[in-house]
C-alpha cells in the first residue's frame, strides 16, 4: 500500500488492480484519514483515469449489499454536482422507461447539488427508502421498477464519509457511485457533470457494462433539451463518440425546467410526469428515450421520445410511480 500511495504522490496513475487494492483498503477502514485524504486529493488534482475508477467500482460492487435480480434491468444515474437546479430527470426518466416496457433498478442518493436528488424525490412521493434486496428484486420482476437507496446498499462508504465531508471538492467516489448499482446491471444511462468524465466513465463502461450511454448535456449530467449533448455510446466493449441535438428526438430547443425551492422541484417533476407542464414533460421524455434506447425497447431516439410522450400522456408513467410507492411499503 505504501508503494501505491507513493505512486499517487508522484503524479503516477494506478492500474486497475492497484486502484482496486487501494479502494478495498479505504472501504475496509484499513487506511487512516490522513492517507485517505492524501490519496483522494492526489487523484483529483491529476484527474482520475478510467483504470482507477474501474478498480474502485470493482471494489465497491464487491462489498455492496447485492440485489438478486432474476431479470435483466437497466439503471439511469448521474454523477450530480452540476449545480444547474434542474428537476431530477434521471429518476423521472427511469419511471417513464419502466412504464414503457423497460425493467429498471434505479440506484440513487440524496442531492449532490440540486434541491432534489433521486432519494429526495422518491421519499417526497412516499416511497420507502428502506426497501431491501429481495423486495427490490421482486418489484423489478413484477412491476418493472424499484428504487434502491445507496447508503442502504453501500454501508462501507460510511467509512470514508467523514473524509469526503472535510474535502472541499468532489472525489473519485462521486464517479464510482453511479457505476456501483447493487443489482450489477449491465446496461446504464449515465450522466456526467464534467466533460472530462465522458471518456473516463466511457472507459469504465467499456470494461464493466454490456451497453451504456454516457452523456454530458452542455453543463448538466442529463440529456439536454437546450442544446447539444455529447455522448459516448458503449456496446460490446466498443465505444463510439457523437453529439445528440434536440432535433434527433424530433423537437426544437426547449428550456430545461429549473426550480428554486424543493416544493417547486417536486411540483414540476410531478406535473411533467402527468403531462401537465410542457418543458418538464419534454425533458423527461428525452431522457426516457435514451433509457429506452439503452434497454433496446426502441431502435432510435426519435422512436423513444414518441413512446415516452405517449406513455406520459396516457397516464401510465404517473400510475407506475404510484404503483412503485405502494409496492415499496
Curated annotation (Swiss-Prot):
Where along the chain is 5-phospho-alpha-D-ribose 1-diphosphate bound? 78, 81-82, 86, 88-91, 106-114, 118
Question: So, what pathway does this thing act in?
Answer: Amino-acid biosynthesis; L-tryptophan biosynthesis; L-tryptophan from chorismate: step 2/5
Residue numbers binding anthranilate 1: 78, 109
Which species expresses this protein natively?
Pyrobaculum islandicum (strain DSM 4184 / JCM 9189 / GEO3)
Task: State what protein this is by name.
Answer: Anthranilate phosphoribosyltransferase
Q: Which family does it belong to?
A: Belongs to the anthranilate phosphoribosyltransferase family.
Q: Is Transmembrane there in the keyword field?
A: no
**Which GO BP annotation is one of this protein's?**
L-tryptophan biosynthetic process
